[in-house]
Amino acid sequence: MRDITHFLLATLLSLATLACRHDTPPADGSLSRQLPPDTKEILRQLNDRDNREEALRLADSLAALPPSDDPWLEIRIAQAVANTLYKFRRDPSDAIRVQERALAVYRLHPDAADDPADLLSTLGHYYRRKGMREKEVEVIQEAMDWCVAHPEKLNRGFVYTFADLSSTYSDLGLYDKAMEAISRSIDYSLQLDSFTISDLYRMKAGIFWELEQHDSTLYYARQALKRGEE
């Protein structure tokens, strides 16, 4: 049983995980307003996995520009730039710097962010990769507090926030709390057309693995594989 479970988990962990979940949102996503055509093209280029060097050059160029006079657009572009720097550069320091820039704009203009929970939890995710535990916990806690205070604004940021919270608890060996957080993330996902549900089931399988509950591990590992094929 343990060998089979280990094989399933190893297979799952070789796939794209929630650690890479913050791809640049599509230009026609859930936005409070429409992006200009040239900005849509910039987002496409920043997210071009087939031309990473050009994407990084563009990201570095945009990061060097002075802030936009439009807070909404500044946050949008900064998040996209940070995402590119995070995905395509080994050291997350540059991604952190640009995401912090987006957060600073949000602090001044709270209504300018379409998804504050995503903005905050993404930064926490970057801090986690850098090993900045205190800052990671601080911003993820803020993201969670925002979700709790705004249940009527349910969106993908809710899913990300509680998945990130689960990862933080897992890192600390607090698996019961990690299970509670990932279960909540799954609940939110199911309310959003099962958004990234395969990754969430994979994460839940990993927590059951740490708890040595192998039947449950197998169940959620298989669910993750099944949903990933849909």
PLM regions: where:
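Bacterial Sec-dependent N-terminal signal peptides
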Residues: 1-42, 123, 216
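N-terminal leader/linker segments that initiate helical-solenoid repeat arrays
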Residues: 20-83, 87-93, 97, 114-115
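Residue register of alpha-helical TPR repeats
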Residues: 37, 76, 118, 156-160, ...
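TPR/TPR-like alpha-solenoid signature
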Residues: 39-40, 79-80, 121, 163, ...
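Residue-level recognition of tetratricopeptide repeat
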Residues: 44, 83-84, 118, 125, ...
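Residue-level detector of the short coil/turn that links helix A to helix B
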Residues: 50, 89-90, 131, 173, ...
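Amphipathic alpha-helical segments of tetratricopeptide repeats
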Residues: 60-64, 100-108, 141-149, 183-190, ...
